[in-house]
Each structure stands twice: as structure tokens, then as C-alpha cells.
């Protein structure tokens, strides 16, 4: 819950924040993460989703779920989708299709790697994109900057 609140507070100035619905399917699970970095990673994904949707009728979901000792954070949008040839390159530092710096998704990948997690992407051009961050529960680097988020 705290990580979700932090993430949404960072999105408060985005005019499309009202298009984001949150579904927390495992509020009692505790995951050891760097909350600032993880919130920034989720914000990067949500901001990309905001760019991909139709501002009038687009929808974005932020879904938290648990499965077999892992916690999943999913950002799902009904936007323009991602072409298959871009899927492999989009995590590369500096890669951008939109003219941005290309640092956002590489940062997401670094944060997920730091937390010993993985990222899955499913997308259909013109229909949707689903990006899932999968992290082990109660794992992470214990460097004094991280704490449990539930």
C-alpha cells in the first residue's frame, strides 16, 4: 500500500492520472524494496502508458498481485502497443522512439535487477501493452536505504 501511495503521489501532476485505476490483490504481503527507486520505476512505466493512450478514452491499470513467493506489479494500458522489433531494444540505455532521453526504461531495468527481479512485456500493436515487474518476496540488498513496503 505505501509503495502504491508513493507512486500515485508522484503521478499527481500528470493530467491523465485520473485514467489510472489501482488494484492491490495482496495488501498483506511484505516485499523488501528501495521504495524511492521502485516508485520511480513504476512512475516511468505509468508515464509511458499515459503517452500511449488516447487522453479521452484510454485506460491504465496498476495491478499488484502475488504468486508463488513473488510479487507482481503490472502496468496495463489500452494504448498504441509496442511493435515486436522494438521489444528487444526498448530496455537499452539511451534507446528512444519518441525523441526522449531513452533513460526511463533502462532505469526500470536497473531497479528490477537490483531487486533480483525480472520484467515481462506483452503487447499487441494498436491494442494494449502489459509490463510486469516480478520481484521475490522478502529479498533485496540490505544497504540501509531499503525497507519493507506493504
Please place each PLM-identified region on the residue numbering.
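Conserved micro-motifs of the catalytic ATP-binding
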Residues: 30-33
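A residue-level detector for a conserved hydrophobic packing site
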Residues: 38-39
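Acidic ATP/Mg2+-coordinating residue in the GHKL
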Residues: 77
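Short conserved segment of the HATPase_c
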Residues: 82-94, 148-149
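Detector for a conserved hydrophobic position within an alpha-helical segment of the HATPase_c
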Residues: 112-113
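Short beta-strand/loop element within the Bergerat-fold HATPase_c
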Residues: 59-69
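Short alpha-helical Gxxx[C/S/T] motif in the catalytic ATP-binding
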Residues: 104, 108
Amino acid at each position: 500500500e505505501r509503495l502504491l501511495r508513493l507512486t500515485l503521489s508522484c503521478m499527481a501532476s500528470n493530467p491523465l492520472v485520473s485514467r489510472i485505476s489501482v488494484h492491490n490483490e495482496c495488501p498483506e504481503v511484505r516485499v523488501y524494496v528501495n521504495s524511492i527507486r521502485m516508485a520511480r520505476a513504476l512512475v516511468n512505466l505509468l508515464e509511458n502508458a499515459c503517452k500511449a493512450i488516447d487522453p479521452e478514452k484510454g485506460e491504465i491499470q496498476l495491478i499488484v498481485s502475488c504468486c508463488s513467493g513473488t510479487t507482481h506489479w503490472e502496468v496495463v494500458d489500452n494504448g498504441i502497443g509496442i511493435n515486436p522489433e522494438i521489444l528487444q531494444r526498448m530496455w537499452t540505455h539511451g534507446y528512444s522512439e519518441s525523441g526522449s532521453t531513452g533513460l526511463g526504461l533502462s532505469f526500470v531495468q536497473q531497479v528490477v535487477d537490483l531487486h533480483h527481479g525480472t520484467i515481462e512485456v506483452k503487447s499487441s500493436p494498436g491494442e494494449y501493452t502489459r509490463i510486469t515487474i516480478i520481484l521475490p518476496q522478502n529479498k533485496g540488498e540490505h544497504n540501509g536505504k531499503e525497507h519493507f513496503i506493504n
